[in-house]
Amino acid sequence: MEDNNTLTEHSVNDAEFWQKRYDDGYTGWDIGKVSPPLQAYIEHLLDNGVSKSAQILIPGAGNAYEAGYLHEQGFSHVYVVDFARLPLDNFAKRYPSFPKAHLLQADFFGLDPAQYQFDYIIEQTFFCAIDPSRRSDYAKQMQKLLKPTGKLVGLLLDKHFESNPPFGGDKQEYETLFQQFFTINTLAPCYNSIKPRQGSELFFILSQKKVQNARVF
């Protein structure tokens, strides 16, 4: 297994970096199941009658447990994007009925907003994996990929780390970043994190700034 001390933040921009982590089994971010806060959010969407044809993106999805759960609930337009091929192949084996065309081995930052527009983008350990110098690019790309009434929803680490991924942060940093591009509907301590992450996660819901009186779920 690769020694974490040998990893540099400059490597995270390369597909080979992430492929090697999967090849070596160095996937400490993978909890082996749907993240409970995101499962609860998906169930909230179902309870509120959100269309199962909603366009949903999960970037940097890895083994994509959330995408699998959405698929099981009948959502038909879920897209998974990851740098690495292996987790996408594994996902396809676990969910043979999932549309192969929706499994994208690609650079999130290279997705064309003219081709892809989403109602929901779900953040789960992608933001903390990118080079911190690209966080503004992340926010800009999210803004471009979301429909006017779209939502960016997910989890952020409320904790600082060393120079290797995961790259953490805190609520104030995230507010400063995201309020430039979005209306912050929710950014609060997560009450239903898995035990190892309790007290170190923030749950958030962001919407496009120009939309007034939009739904907040």
What are these regions (language model features)?
Residues T125, A129:
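Short catalytic micro-motifs in class I SAM-dependent methyltransferases
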